[in-house]
């Protein structure tokens, strides 16, 4: 049987496609877990292929003409992993949380929409709830609208749903499961029991309130999933950055959490951010052709963006690094801190090592212009 999930993992681990260390580690984690006979979970290829096939039956209505969707390798890996891994001798799926970090224009909204459609009608759960969440209602509506576009673009799919635009609710006529858009600014603060919760652009969330609210509401729901889909950001005090660091520890093998799926596409810390080939590590969709060759036209367009960012600095450079390169940076409006350079200054010395040593303090008294 075809196994598109594992095929992509092998493509990456065998070095046949440019990738960053985090993506390599995610794929190797999949292969290592499959090879471990004592691992409490197994990978169900049939289940993975079923859900990948569902995604490829969706229709993209945006553009001049509607066209049947064809998933790329990394999308197969994500979908197949989330639905394929399950506990041995059980139908309970392995992953109850997911963290996916992709650069902008790499199919985040598609992925969220595909997952909503799958869970609402094809996952076998009756009278469930699927939530599309974000910091603001307007942003949550964007994910919801992606599902609505899939439905309106396909007459066969449209027969399975009732769409209410006025309150952003979609109801599956097969399972009576609803898909709703909810912002962090919603008036209700609890009672969110769902089978799937999409936490969109998690980097923009000032607290983990919404994420925890969704996760806690699923505690008694079998095969539920809370899925954060985001780009990198510039607030290192945000819960998303904390989750990102936690995920990196799991990928490196320093921490173990088998129920958390992780897929991060980013450049490595020592990569030159102005080298176009490095950008492909953070952009698994829009810089690649379907045959896994680099898309020279798209790279040329990104070069123009890079030139603008490099010359203008400030917000332009921040947006280029976080949104286009999917790279976390520290930015407070006045200066940009390179995290790789900052971490390179790390030391194993402690405060105890500083005792009885001279200390020098530099202060800049100048005030910024009013």
State where each predicted segment sits:
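Phosphate/NTP-binding elements of NTP-utilizing enzymes
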Residues: 2-363
């Amino acid at each position: 049987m075809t196994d598109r999930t594992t095929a992509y993992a092998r493509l990456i681990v065998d070095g046949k496609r440019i990738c960053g260390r985090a993506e390599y580690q995610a794929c190797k984690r999949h292969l290592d877990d499959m090879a471990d006979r004592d691992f409490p979970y197994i990978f169900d290829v049939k289940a993975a292929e079923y859900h990948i096939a569902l995604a490829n039956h969706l229709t993209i209505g945006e553009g001049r003409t509607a066209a049947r969707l064809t998933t790329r390798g990394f999308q197969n890996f994500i979908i197949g992993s989330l639905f394929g891994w399950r506990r041995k001798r059980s139908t309970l799926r392995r992953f109850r949380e997911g963290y996916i970090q992709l650069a902008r224009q790499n199919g985040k909204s598609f992925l969220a929409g595909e997952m909503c459609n799958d869970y609402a009608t094809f996952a076998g759960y009756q009278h469930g709830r699927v939530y599309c969440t974000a910091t603001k209602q307007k942003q949550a509506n964007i994910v919801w609208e992606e599902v609505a576009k899939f439905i309106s673009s396909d007459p066969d799919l449209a027969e399975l749903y009732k769409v209410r635009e006025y309150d952003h609710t979609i109801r599956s006529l097969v399972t009576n499961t609803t898909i709703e858009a909810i912002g962090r600014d919603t008036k209700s603060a609890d009672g969110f029991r769902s089978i799937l919760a999409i936490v969109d652009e998690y980097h923009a969330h000032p607290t983990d309130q919404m994420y925890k609210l969704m996760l806690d509401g699923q505690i008694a729901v079998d095969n539920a999933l809370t899925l954060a889909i985001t780009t990198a950001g510039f607030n290192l005090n945000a819960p998303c950055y904390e989750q990102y660091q936690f995920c990196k520890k799991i990928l490196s093998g320093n921490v173990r959490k088998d129920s958390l799926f992780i897929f991060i596409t980013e450049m490595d810390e020592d990569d030159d951010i102005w080298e176009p080939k490095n950008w492909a590590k953070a952009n698994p969709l829009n810089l690649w052709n379907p045959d896994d060759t680099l898309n020279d036209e798209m790279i040329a367009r990104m070069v123009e963006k890079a030139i603008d960012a490099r010359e203008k600095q400030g917000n332009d450079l921040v947006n280029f690094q976080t949104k286009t390169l999917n790279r976390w940076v520290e930015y407070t409006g006045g200066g940009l801190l390179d995290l790789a350079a900052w971490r390179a200054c790390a030391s194993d010395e402690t405060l105890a090592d500083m005792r009885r040593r001279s200390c020098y303090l530099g202060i800049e008294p100048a005030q910024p212009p009013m």
